[in-house]
């Protein structure tokens, strides 16, 4: 059971959970490895007057698939350091491919765009979106997509297509971009936690460089400090529109 899953169980079930001394949740990470060459070997055997020589061989080391990848491809993209009002980020680079940052399961897909400017319901402001829960226990949210390339229940690996950057939801009134949020999963449909609970830039920066920086510990720590966030969000007036 992941640290995030245990914290969610305690918060939702309203039971006491005694914590041992703080430890970091185990995170499956795979460092990028440069292929290496095994030393060449030459073996000679002699039987009577006949000598047999084995040709030197080389063996390339296995290069594991990265645990995390930069989730935007096909365009140069940019992003700031903060988002107004809460912890998330907007990524700019219209038409960029949006891909899975890690392995996991697609849990929510919305292909309609119910946002109405006159009402401006924050539950619908994301337009077309995709949410996935990584095998690391973290939830990843991509909003304002144009085309969507996946379905609910799809199992994805790092780099699998989720959609393209677009201008749906309240992005119709602004610049084409993708809203990227990182949070923990909630047991019921909501939008307040889903939109983002930690700042993504340092993770995007690392993944862009091929570094395997996991948000698991930060997400777990934030959940521990806000154990009622999911329950509060579920009771919000517009939760059913999320």
Residue ranges: model-predicted function:
Residues 14-16:
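C-terminal motif of bacterial Sec signal peptides marking the signal peptidase cleavage site
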Residues 149-150, 161, 167-176:
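Short glycine/proline-centered loop/turn elements that form peptide/ligand docking sites
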Residues 92-94, 99, 133-160:
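Short histidine-centered loop motifs in beta-beta connectors
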Residues 110, 146-149, 166, 186:
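A generic structural motif
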Residues 1-6:
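Bacterial N-terminal signal peptides that target proteins for export
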Residues 19, 32, 47-129, 158, ...:
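Surface-exposed, glycine-biased beta-strand/turn segments
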Residues 177-189:
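A short hydrophobic beta-strand segment most commonly corresponding to one strand
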Residues 19-29:
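Bacterial Sec signal peptide processing site at the extreme N-terminus
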């Amino acid at each position: 059971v992941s640290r995030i899953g245990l914290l969610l169980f305690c918060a939702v079930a309203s039971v006491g959970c005694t914590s041992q001394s703080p430890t970091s949740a185990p995170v499956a990470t795979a460092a990028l490895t440069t292929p290496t060459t095994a030393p060449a070997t030459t073996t000679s055997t002699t039987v009577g007057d006949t000598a047999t020589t084995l040709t030197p061989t080389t063996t390339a080391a296995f290069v594991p698939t990265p645990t995390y990848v930069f989730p935007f491809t096909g365009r140069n993209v940019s992003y700031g350091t903060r988002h107004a009002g809460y912890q998330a980020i907007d990524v700019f680079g219209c038409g960029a491919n949006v891909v899975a940052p890690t392995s996991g399961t697609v849990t929510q897909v919305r292909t309609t765009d119910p946002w109405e400017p006159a009402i401006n319901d924050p539950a619908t402001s994301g337009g077309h979106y995709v949410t996935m829960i990584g095998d690391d226990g973290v939830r990843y949210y991509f909003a304002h997509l144009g085309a969507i390339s996946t379905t609910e229940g799809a199992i994805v690996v790092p780099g699998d297509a989720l959609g393209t950057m677009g201008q749906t939801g309240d992005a119709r009134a602004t610049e084409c971009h993708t809203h990227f949020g990182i949070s923990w999963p909630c047991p019921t449909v909501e939008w307040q936690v889903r939109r983002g609970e930690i700042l993504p830039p340092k993770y995007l920066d690392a993944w862009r460089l091929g570094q395997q920086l996991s948000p698991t510990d930060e997400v777990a720590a934030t959940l521990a400090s806000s154990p009622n966030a999911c329950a509060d969000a579920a009771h919000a007036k517009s939760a059913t529109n999320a």
